């Protein structure tokens, strides 16, 4: 049984990447540079706009983050796909938090809109995930809407983020 904490530290998230948080069969988060959050500040099983679950997480922005050096030279900006991936990471984390087992895989997104950017001068990115549905049968899948904010301003929105958990990904 998974301890359902309401918040998680960076150390907890790193432990998830080593399969130490939700057990050896739980979905791990990415590790290293691909872990796109520093903390989860709120998790609820019944909250959010659809009353099906909610997560809020944060990433501290500093000018020395790895992607600013290569995307782009003389025009540093966080790649939008990393914000989208962070939202998928959080959907998968939620499924593990609920006790789901397997390896997480992004399955799609309905629509993504970018209306701003993350520059090295920013201080904090906030991710908000509102769950619409969780299927927990033979297939374990989360469906959610998400927002990415930079310093309190919404800059990306995504509808129908889909993540599934798979016991065997060899034929995926």
Swiss-Prot record:
One record GO biological process: unsaturated fatty acid biosynthetic process
Gene Ontology cellular component annotations, sorted alphabetically: cytoplasm
Span of the signal peptide: none
InterPro entries from the UniProt entry: FabA, FabA_FabZ, HotDog_dom_sf
Compartments (UniProt record): Cytoplasm
Assigned EC number: 4.2.1.59, 5.3.3.14
UniProt KW Isomerase keyword: yes
HAMAP family in UniProt: FabA
Name of the protein in question: 3-hydroxydecanoyl-[acyl-carrier-protein] dehydratase
Organism: Photorhabdus laumondii subsp. laumondii (strain DSM 15139 / CIP 105565 / TT01)
Lineage: Bacteria, Pseudomonadati, Pseudomonadota, Gammaproteobacteria, Enterobacterales
